[in-house]
Every structure is written in structure tokens, then in C-alpha cells.
Amino acid sequence: MKRDEKYFKGCILGGAIGDALGRPIELKKLKEIKATYGSKGINNLTLNDKGIAEITDDTQMTLFTAEGILRANCKKGRCYIPAVVYNAYLRWYSTQRNIDTKGYDECTYNSYLLKYDELYEDRGAGNTCLTSLSKEEIGSIKNPINNSKGCGGVMRVAPIGLMYNKKEAFRLGCDCAALTHGHPSGYISGGMLSCIISCIIEGMEIDEAINCAISFAKDMDGYCECVETVEKAVKLSKDDLVDTDAIRMIGEGWTSDEALAIAIYSSLKYKDDFKKALICSVNHDGDSDSTGAICGNILGAYLGIDNIPKEWIDVIELKELLENISTDLLTGYEESEEWFEKYLEN
């Protein structure tokens, strides 16, 4: 059992670090990455002029997912959890679109996260997330909001795996991804990642956690593409191939199934070395920040914060907030004025 602060922090900060590692090379081809960073690609965090490694929309949305499920927990089952998470995503959307929320519903737009200037920064927010949230219409598995399988549905759901048992995590991961992504691969991948993290926290090995997630996924309509991509990554992780060649066979990570699979490949290949796994997960032709974030979530939950390079932890943007929300996810609920101010909707 890894229901311990160091594994929760490992998951959340690990994801942010993977996100930051991949950020400078997102949209770049591997050839260009190697020309800029050397034959092994990028292998260290890029710092801004303040000495900070900046996160992207992946970590921004992960924080709002965490806030959403913590708010839902305050309601003690008297709510539809995805709807509470959806309201959290509307808060994130308001930061990205510079919306003046004065006069808006206070329950939706009152949040301590909105005090952090960094969460208003444009860090490459995905078009599907922005378009879906602009409709103010809640997507669901039964009533898909679109046919998108972009990776924006999976890259944000890791906190769900920390809060819920594996069965609930899979279901809720699917539901929360489906808020904005309507293709089966777009939301089943969210369920699988949430389930994998929940299983790891329960004490499973990574390969066991993946098998558990696959078993849940196979009960869903339209599971084939996502499961086949993940199974391909598992197989490739056991082969003696150059990592970049293996990842090229999986894809580029722009779709949810590919992003999850690349992260799974890297986590299995280097399950005892956080740094090597993250470097592997971002050096490819595609969506490097998302594959890095998901890999960081998985391996951070597995290895814990003590096995993440301290020099990376010290420079990650919003480090204190990430640590605090990790601790809150472990606590789940607390009868205190401070807790109610943070997570109880008025």
C-alpha cells in the first residue's frame, strides 16, 4: 500500500516535472530536438529568467481536476462528481479566456486556485478543451460532446487515481475525460490512467496495474483502439529496440491512446529510474509535454517523491501549491475552516 504523502506528491509533482521537461520540445521533430540538445535529446529542465521550469496546460488542468474532486468530497456523495469537476474546468477556462466572472455564479467561479497568476498564463491550451468548455454543455459517455480523442482528456485525470479505488477511479476517469472528449479512445484512456494510478497506490506493480486497467476497459464499448495501443506499448517495452524507434511505432502522442501508451512504454522500460523514464517519454516527434506528464504521474506514484531528482523538484513552477494539493488529496476531507474556505462551494 502506498497511501502515503511521498507517493501522492510523487504523482502530482512527477507529472508537473514531466510536463515541464517536454514543454520546450512540443511540436518539434526528433531530428530538430537532437540538433538543439544533442544526440540523446533533451535531458534536463529548461528554466526561465527567474530560474523556474514552467508547466503547461496539462498541469494547470490537473490542479483543477484535483480541486474538483476535493470539492465533490465535501458534499459527501450528495452530488454528481463529474459535474463538480466540470465546474472546476470552467474556472480554468475563465483563466485562459480572460473572462470577467464578476456577477457569475459564485459557486462555479469562486476558487482559491484563481489567486495564482501562473494559472492564467497561456501555456498551449488544447483546442478541444477550450471549444468544449466554451459551449457550457457537459459532455458524457452517453451524450458525447464531440468525436475527439485528443490527449487533453487523459493528461489531466491523475488526481482521480489518488482519491478513489480502482473500479471507481476507472469509471470516474472515463466520465471526467468525456466532459470534453467524446471519442471512446478519448475517455477510456482517462479511465485507464486513473485506474493504473489507483492500482499502484494499492501496492500493485506497474504491469499488474496496466492489466487491471485493460480488464476494465474491455467492458466498455469502443475499447479496441485504446487497449490495442496500450498492449502494443507493453510488448515493445520488452523488446530490445532503440526507444525512439519503439515510440515511433506507437505514435506521436497527440491522441489519448498514444499519449498513454508512450507513457506506459517509458514507465515499464525504466521503472526504477524516474529520470531515464521521463527523458525517454518526451524525446519523440509528438506531444512531448503530455507524454512526459503522464509518465511522471505513473512513475511518481510508483517510486515516490524521494526518487525524483531534487534539483528538478526545487525548480518546478508552483511547487508549494503542487505539494499542498497532493497532501489535500491524501487527506480527502477535513473538518476545518481552512478546508471549507478552499473546497466547500458556497
Residue ranges and their predicted role:
Residues 1-346:
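Structured, active/binding-site neighborhoods that engage oxygen-rich ligands
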